[in-house]
Structure formats: C-alpha cells, structure tokens
Amino acid sequence: MTLFADTAGERLDAFLARQPGSLSRSAAQKLIEEGMVTRNGVPGKKNDRLNVGDRVEYTIPEAKPVDIVPTEMPLDIVYEDDDLLVINKPKGLVVHPAAGHADDTLVNGLLYALGDDLSGINGELRPGIVHRIDKDTSGLLAVAKNDYAHTMLASQLKDHTMARTYEAIVCGVMKEDCGTVDAPIGRHPTDRKKMCVTQRGGRNAVTHWEVVRRYKGYTHIRCKLETGRTHQIRVHMAYIGHPILGDTVYGRKKPELGQSSQCLHAGALCFRHPRDGHPVMVFAELPQYFRDVLDKLEKMK
C-alpha cells in the first residue's frame, strides 16, 4: 500500500496508525521493525519524522497458519453473525496462549468451535481477538471472524467509539458520586509484569466512573473506558486510593470477603457493526461470584 504524508513532523508509526481502518500503533511499529515499511524508498524507522509529500509504502504479510491445539470447552456466546461474535468470558479463563497456558485458553476454545472462521490480523497466538480482558476479569469480549471485521472493530477501539462499560467493587467508600481519572499508564519501572501511572513514557489513559451503591467499607461502581490500556481500571482505581476488591497485585495483599482476584466484570459492549454501521449493544448480567459479594455487603450494612 502506498500513502503520502500530509503533515510535517509526524512520526512514521503514528502516521500509519491514524489511517482509517488501518493498523494499531504497536502493529505499525512491528511492521517497521521487520523492514516492511519504506519512506521515499528507504527502510523507515518508527521515530522518523515525515515531511509533507513523503511517499510511505508498506506491506502487511499474510497471516501465519495457526499452530494452536483446538480444545473443546463451553463458550457463552451472547451475540453472533457472519462477521463477529461476542463472548461472555468467565473469570479465570486466559484469553490467549502463554507460558503455562498452551491448550486451555479462550483462543483454544474458539479454534475448536470456529476453526478457520477467525481473523488472522493479530497473529497466530491471537486469532480473532480484537481486544483483551484480564484472566480474572469476567465479561464481554469481541471476536472477529474475518480480517475486514477485525480492521473495522480495531479502528473503533482506536478512535474511542467502541463503548466498554465495567462493573467493579472497590475498597473504601467513595465520597463523590462520579468522576474521571485522566492519568497516563506505562510499564512499572521495577516490576515488568505490572503497570503504573507515570508521566515518563506513559500513554494517555482515561477512565470515567460513577457510584452504583455504597456499602460499609466498599463501593460498587460502574466504569466507562475512554482508552484501553493494560490493567487500566485496576491501575486507575488503585491510583485514586480505591483499589479493586480482591486485586492483590494493585491493592490489598490479603483476600477480603473470600475474593483472591479482582471483582471486575465487563458488563456492556456497544459498537457499530463493521459491515453496515448499525449499532450493536450487548450486555452480560453480573456473574454469580459478583452477586455473592454484593449479598455479603448487603448483610454487613
């Protein structure tokens, strides 16, 4: 594909990432690193600054064949058509294969259920996966069946028009009824498995929240993501002094109310259909573990 720069001083990777229905920033950087992008006929670097009229050419390689073991497992499919499906992921299920999880992930289950009917844009380890939620977060996850749907859904994520709403129980009683956390998130400087709020190298991250109900020592809140950084809600809530109940990574180290992992549920997902643009709104009821915690909190009042 050939493009021509229309803005002076823009980074090469940012230029590629802002093209309609195009690549994510990380995918653009990977293409550049692999030598698949040229600027005026010369291999580009991700931090190259463009001049107006620069010719940018890039090639997206064909998806590698998936070499993952299909695994039969129950899948709670709450929406499906020819282009995509939406899964209600249970707590404890890893999304894609990684160390220690070679054949028991959502991707393994999707390959068993759908076979070749998954997009290949995210590579062989994440076929069809448009966005991710943590292992111990339950709720809705969009899966693309073809590359066109994947590209269009990813574009909505990038321009913040895919609405994702989460239910959470946080530690402490929130004084305000609603608020916004606008704080950049980046990799933790000493613990590479964690994220943190940081001005140095952090990426823009915005979380809107509102109180659903207050309890003794805890608050049930609803969060809406404006961006989608790794661990965003968990990091932002801990940053303002109200870590997610059960989150022993960013919050209190000892389990509370029988929860040893976060009480966080992706309850609503709204987007434009990639084929014709009509609105799709999908909802998932609170899972049993979440309702059990609310019952305990009711009895504590």
Residues covered by each model-derived region:
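Pseudouridine synthases involved in rRNA/tRNA modification
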Residues: 1-27, 75, 190, 200-206, ...
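Short alpha-helix capping/helix-loop boundary micro-motifs
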Residues: 40-45, 217-220, 255
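Residue-level recognition of well-ordered beta-strand positions that form the cores
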Residues: 59, 169, 184, 210, ...
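Short beta-strand micro-motifs in enzyme catalytic cores
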Residues: 85, 166, 219-221, 267
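Short, surface-exposed secondary-structure edge patches
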Residues: 45-49, 222, 261
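Thr-Gly-centered strand-to-loop micro-motif
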Residues: 39-40, 96-97, 144, 195-199, ...
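Short flexible coil/turn linkers enriched for glycine and charged/polar residues
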Residues: 81, 135-136, 162, 203, ...
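RNA pseudouridine synthases
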Residues: 1-180, 184-189, 283-296
